[in-house]
Amino acid sequence: MIINAKGPASFAEKYIVRSIWENKFPPGSILPAERELSELIGVTRTTLREVLQRLARDGWLTIQHGKPTRVNNFWETSGLNILETIADLNPEGFPVLVDQLLSARTNVSAIYFRGALRHNPETAVEILARIHGMEDSAEAYAEFDYDLHHTLAFSSGNPLYVLILNGFKGLYSRVGRYYFSSAEARKLAMDFYIELEKLAKRHAYGEVPALMRSYGINSGKMWQKLKDAMPADINQDPHG
């Protein structure tokens, strides 16, 4: 098992998570005792204990006082916060994960974009005004796109959408910078922003779903053209 890590705790965390992912510690099984596991991984028991607590908070493990530590089925117990980890664990499946991420984001964003234009159209108009002086670069578009979604999610009347977006953030920021490196993708996005601004100024929230659906289809087609040339290391968290 080859693991790139920045310290003992990071190594231990990645070792355990990869072992769960590869079914060496299958769901429902009991982890080796603390002493045995710390020797196996090569870290102190104090470090291991901290790592186990963190993995339990993320849903990978169940820790109960006086009982052995049990491995969970993370698909049932974890949240969006493990997206980055899954991307790192499964580089071959990363393009599929991104497809699923973008599909989920498109479907959810149609709800909060409509809500924002209904409840806070002035906020939508204010942030969309930024498009008129925006630099034509991948970084500028990726940053604006995230800010737009974050602002409209918060203004939709249901701030829980912001928490969902936060779960996408790290992964989407890397994919977004790559996607918007295409001039054609930036043009497609700008056309969408301009139309959305028109709707916001007219408070025409009822027309948002059709616009979102059209942009979702077109940007999806654009992504299919771009994804085969994705950089090999785009799945890796630069901070992990």
Swiss-Prot record:
What PANTHER family does its record include? FATTY ACID METABOLISM REGULATOR PROTEIN, TRANSCRIPTIONAL REGULATOR, GNTR FAMILY
Q: What is its main location?
A: cytoplasm
Q: What is this protein called?
A: Fatty acid metabolism regulator protein
PROSITE patterns this protein is in?
HTH_GNTR
Read off the SMART domains from this record. HTH_GNTR
Q: Name one GO molecular function term.
A: DNA binding
State the superkingdom: Bacteria
Q: Which keywords appear in this protein's UniProt record, sorted alphabetically?
A: Activator, Cytoplasm, DNA-binding, Fatty acid metabolism, Lipid metabolism, Repressor, Transcription, Transcription regulation
CDD domains in UniProt: WHTH_GntR (cd07377)
Q: Outline the subunit composition.
A: Homodimer.
Its biological function? Multifunctional regulator of fatty acid metabolism.
**Where in the numbering of this chain does the HTH gntR-type domain appear?**
6-74
Q: Name one Pfam family in it.
A: FadR_C
